[in-house]
Amino acid sequence: MAHVGDCTQTPWLPVLVVSLMCSARAEYSNCGENEYYNQTTGLCQECPPCGPGEEPYLSCGYGTKDEDYGCVPCPAEKFSKGGYQICRRHKDCEGFFRATVLTPGDMENDAECGPCLPGYYMLENRPRNIYGMVCYSCLLAPPNTKECVGATSGASANFPGTSGSSTLSPFQHAHKELSGQGHLATALIIAMSTIFIMAIAIVLIIMFYILKTKPSAPACCTSHPGKSVEAQVSKDEEKKEAPDNVVMFSEKDEFEKLTATPAKPTKSENDASSENEQLLSRSVDSDEEPAPDKQGSPELCLLSLVHLAREKSATSNKSAGIQSRRKKILDVYANVCGVVEGLSPTELPFDCLEKTSRMLSSTYNSEKAVVKTWRHLAESFGLKRDEIGGMTDGMQLFDRISTAGYSIPELLTKLVQIERLDAVESLCADILEWAGVVPPASQPHAAS
């Protein structure tokens, strides 16, 4: 039975311990800021206060007290009124308040400041706190302030310099600081003005360079457009060598007869003109494949000259037709230059540009004639190969040259230079139809 009774009384022990701890915590929490709990009396007791010139060492209050709690004297330049206050620093009359020291401070009392230093004054409507005792420089004082009358002479008299050194008054220090700030502001203004002027100069130089490098108007729109273009075409034709039309004779005696001829025939002006006419016919018709340039033996050159002499009568009729059509194209070309002067290619109708783009494509000729395409036209405008490689057709080229500032007459001039008179004729006809201008009367083509 006793064993059973011990088991029934054991659960009450934790409850008793918890209740005692809660009651002790309640006693500690009832103590004030400067009180500690006395376990002997079970009451809150006041912490021992410190005397003047002393401050508490360690902590005491709110029910707790350090074992080594006590009071220690204040260090130098600090004071305390006693009680539970810590030591505080004396007023810095000269450094902070800009005033004279009336009474120096000690361990029990604070320092007392007197009147303002020379060159400083106190505000009349000052706040009623510690900042109301601050003195301000006479440089910022309103006129007729009595403390600042004769501040310059008084400041220099009250602050004499020591032997071998010079001492500036507070008034002179303030004046020096303000003058330094003024010089800094002036330097900043000059620097900003210089940067602004340089930026404007750079912009003007860039604009002048752009205007200077802008392409000028084409020569086709001058007083004699047809003649200038014709001269340009003739110059391009002269730079190219005439293709050698080589004829291989089967008769052996005829070949030996030609090789035995001592006199070498010379080309006449009619032969040279016929060769140029053949080149122009390839550009207009775009259906003949030019023969590759070859450098053979003297016998082959003689054969070529003989062949040209035999075909002189046959090519004369064809050259007359080519010249007639060439003159017609140049007349229409000159008329179009005057109509669309200053317009860009993208201002033309879409169908007109698309038709010209198809004519300049590499798949335009069914017989695979070797003619200049829109890529050659792009090279004549000075575009780089990587830029041309990013294009797919002539429409993109027209957009590119329009963005670069080229006009329709310049486009026609480039087409003439690359020997695409067929494209020039088609584009001029579409432009005249779009502009509502009657084309010049054309002569009938001569039979070729």
From Swiss-Prot:
Picking any one GO molecular function of the record gives: signaling receptor activity
Give the Extracellular compartment stretches of this protein: 27-187
Which cysteine-cysteine pairs are annotated as disulfide bonds in the entry? C31-C44, C47-C60, C50-C71, C74-C87, C93-C113, C135-C148
The record's annotation in InterPro entries points to: DEATH-like_dom_sf, Death_EDAR, EDAR_N, TNR19/27/EDAR
User: Effect of altering R420Q?
Assistant: In ECTD10A and ECTD10B; abolishes NF-kappa-B activation and reduces JNK activation
Tissue expression, as annotated, is: Detected in fetal kidney, lung, skin and cultured neonatal epidermal keratinocytes. Not detected in lymphoblast and fibroblast cell lines.
Which residue intervals are annotated with compositional bias (Polar residues) in the record?
A: 271-283
Q: Where is the signal peptide?
A: 1-26
Membrane topology listed for this record: Single-pass type I membrane protein
A single GO BP: cytokine-mediated signaling pathway
**Consequence recorded when altering V370A:** Associated with increase in hair thickness; results in decreased downstream activity of NFKB1 48 hours after transfection into cells
**Keyword line:** Apoptosis, Developmental protein, Differentiation, Disease variant, Disulfide bond, Ectodermal dysplasia, Glycoprotein, Membrane, Receptor, Repeat, Signal, Transmembrane, Transmembrane helix
Q: Which Pfam families match?
A: Death_EDAR (PF24979)
Q: Where are the transmembrane segments?
A: 188-208
Q: Where are the TNFR-Cys repeats?
A: 30-71, 73-113, 115-148
Q: Which GO terms describe its cellular component?
A: apical part of cell; membrane; plasma membrane
> Which portions of the chain have biased composition (kind: Basic and acidic residues)?
233-243
Q: Where in the cell is it found?
A: Membrane
Where's it mainly located?
A: membrane
Q: What does the UniProt entry list as the effect of changing R375H? A: In ECTD10B; the mutant protein does not interact with EDARADD and is functionally inactive
Q: Which disease is it linked to?
A: Ectodermal dysplasia 10A, hypohidrotic/hair/nail type, autosomal dominant: A form of ectodermal dysplasia, a heterogeneous group of disorders due to abnormal development of two or more ectodermal structures. It is an autosomal dominant condition characterized by hypotrichosis, abnormal or missing teeth, and hypohidrosis due to the absence of sweat glands. Ectodermal dysplasia 10B, hypohidrotic/hair/tooth type, autosomal recessive: A disorder due to abnormal development of two or more ectodermal structures, and characterized by sparse hair (atrichosis or hypotrichosis), abnormal or missing teeth and the inability to sweat due to the absence of sweat glands.
Q: What does this protein do?
A: Receptor for EDA isoform A1, but not for EDA isoform A2. Mediates the activation of NF-kappa-B and JNK. May promote caspase-independent cell death.
Q: How does it assemble?
A: Binds to EDARADD. Associates with TRAF1, TRAF2, TRAF3 and NIK.
Entry protein name = Tumor necrosis factor receptor superfamily member EDAR
Q: Whose protein is this, by species?
A: Homo sapiens
Question: What gene is this protein a product of?
Answer: EDAR
